[in-house]
């Protein structure tokens, strides 16, 4: 006889996309027929056969502290901003629940690739002394979930399914 899973609920959501910095603006832009696709002009994209992509603008990260911007990968930063939106939306339903009864489950394809790329360049161009000592904590796949749990004070665990 199968064990019945514990009930769970999604009570908030967030998004940071090329179309908008929150779910409402993203949905409105989508409904208005806007496209988040643009020309790629970054140095790293010059050798790519594809010259377009959907990029979240750097301005989307401005609300994060400079310290957090230096000590976390863009992947974790975007996850944190979206999680803050979801947390705000869910707050009326989660008030009074002990933090140890709330968990973060945040999936990622691979984690901090921009950190891996940047630090590889530091290593090859400047040697081992130029590599950021926070490289590993910044690039591991579970960094976004951990950052969200720390930021929101969630104590029930931080889990990262990785494809």
Residue ranges and their predicted role:
Residues 1-157:
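Conserved "HGTGT" condensation-loop signature of ketosynthase/thiolase-family condensing enzymes
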Residues 157-163:
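Short loop-beta-helix segment that forms the pyridoxal 5′-phosphate
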